[in-house]
């Protein structure tokens, strides 16, 4: 055991998993925060069609440039789509890669009867759903950026028969994001020290489900 051997040992440490973990957590946090903001902005329709109209025009730059530039919406959607791909690539290394692995995972999850393990399984399932449905939604936003507003969005939802997709997407993204933030807080030790960690975790779980239910 000498300085040279220790230096060689350090040089052989594979830091890629740690970096991928960091990328996964950071991109997931960014996507979850974006989703919360997105849901609050979309809910402007509850204040009336004029409120949602002004929100849509704001993101087209009307109040900055004096005229709408739907390309700004395309750029935002493309950036979110790229971030989603980065997050998916970083997370996929932890997901089962075959039917046999999924079956084994489900069997172990049932035998463990551990709530947080079930949450991870739900996150895997909702992640698979989001890989398809979120891509469809973002592609629509990128290719039809001017069709966002109280009338256009309602027409797409009803006449375009997109409501089943958006309904499944809503539940999937809220479950995935809420569980992800809960697990992120636990993983990186962001909770303050407590004399009763179990009670603290239960409070965090209740907070997570309350926020998910709110959105």
Language model features with spans:
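Membrane-embedded alpha-helical bundles that constitute the cytochrome b-like, heme-associated redox core
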Residues: 1-215
């Amino acid at each position: 055991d000498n300085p040279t051997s220790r230096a060689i040992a350090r040089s052989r440490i594979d830091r890629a998993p740690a970096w991928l973990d960091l990328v996964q957590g950071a991109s997931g946090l960014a996507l979850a925060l974006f989703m919360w903001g997105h849901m609050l902005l979309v809910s402007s329709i509850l204040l009336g069609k004029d409120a949602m109209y002004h929100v849509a025009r704001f993101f087209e730059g009307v109040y900055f440039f004096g005229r709408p530039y739907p390309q700004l919406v395309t750029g935002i959607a493309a950036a979110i789509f790229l971030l989603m791909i980065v997050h998916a690539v970083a997370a996929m290394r932890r997901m089962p890669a075959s039917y046999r692995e999924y079956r084994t995972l489900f069997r172990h999850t049932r035998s463990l009867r551990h709530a947080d393990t079930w949450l991870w399984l739900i996150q895997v399932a909702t992640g698979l759903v989001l890989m398809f449905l979120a891509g469809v939604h973002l592609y629509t936003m990128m290719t039809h950026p001017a069709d966002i507003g109280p009338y256009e969005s309602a027409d797409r939802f009803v006449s375009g028969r997109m409501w089943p997709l958006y309904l499944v997407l809503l539940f999937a993204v809220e479950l995935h994001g809420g569980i992800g933030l809960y697990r992120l807080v636990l993983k990186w030790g962001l909770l303050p020290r407590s004399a009763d960690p179990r009670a603290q975790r239960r409070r965090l779980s209740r907070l997570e489900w309350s926020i998910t239910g709110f959105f």
